[in-house]
Amino acid sequence: MPLKDLPLDAQPREKLLARGPAALSDAELLAILLRTGLAGKGVLQLAQELLDDPVRDSATGRSAGGGFGGIAGLLHASSQDLQRIKGLGPAKRAELMAVLELARRALAQQLREREVFDSPQAVQHYLQLHLAGRTHEVFAVLFLDSGNRLIAMEELFRGTLTQTSVYPREVVLRALHHHAAAVVLAHNHPSGSVQPSRADEALTQTLKAALALVDVRVLDHVIVAPGAALSMAEQGLV
C-alpha cells in the first residue's frame, strides 16, 4: 500500500514527528530513508524485505538472496551488496551507507569520551555495527588507554566461515604500537550463534597470557552475530 493511502497518523514521517522515533518499527524508520517504493511494491514492503533474514546457500553458508537480517546487517552491507536490490539506486545506497558511518562515529566518540565499561552495551553495539553483518569470520581488537577509553579499533585477522587464524605476536605488537594499557578482543560468528567454542576459550587464554608479558590486560572477549552479542567476561571465561 502506498504511504499516501495510509491514515495520516500512521504514515512513518508524521508518526515520528508526533510520537518520536522510538514509536516506529525498524521498517518504518527505514521507509523514511527510502522515501519511495517500486511499481507494485510500497516503500514499507520494500523496507521490510530489506530487513528480512537472508537466504543462505546450504553448501557455502553465504547469502543467496533475501534480506540482510535486520538493521545491523543492512547497515553493514557494502555498496556491492546493496546494488543487487532492485529499487536501491545510487542515492539511496549512499544514504544508507552514510547512516552507518554516522552511527559508527557516534559510538566511537562515546567510547573515547568515557570508560568503556561504564557502558558495556555501547561496546557491544559498536562491535555489532562493525562485525555482525560479515559473511566471513573477522577478529578485531579494541585498544584502550589506562582509563579504559578507546584508542583505536583494528581488524587484525580474517578467515573462512568456520575458522580464523589469530597470531598472538601480531596482537602484542599492535598493542605496543598503540601504547595500550588494555584490550577488548572481538570476533564474529557468521553462523548466527554467539556461544563461545572451546577454541574461542583457548584463544582467549593464549592471548591473555601473551599480553600479560607486556602488562596489557584483556578486559573482555566479545562474540557478535546478527542481532546478538555475548561477553565472555560476563560468562567467567576471561
Swiss-Prot record:
Residues 116-238 form the MPN domain. Zn(2+) binds at H187, H189, D200. One of its GO terms (biological process) is proteolysis. Keywords: Hydrolase, Metal-binding, Metalloprotease, Protease, Zinc. CDD domains: MPN_DUF2466. The keyword Zinc applies. Gene3D superfamilies: Cytidine Deaminase, domain 2. The keyword Transmembrane does not apply. GO terms for molecular function: metal ion binding; metallopeptidase activity. This is UPF0758 protein Ajs_3450.
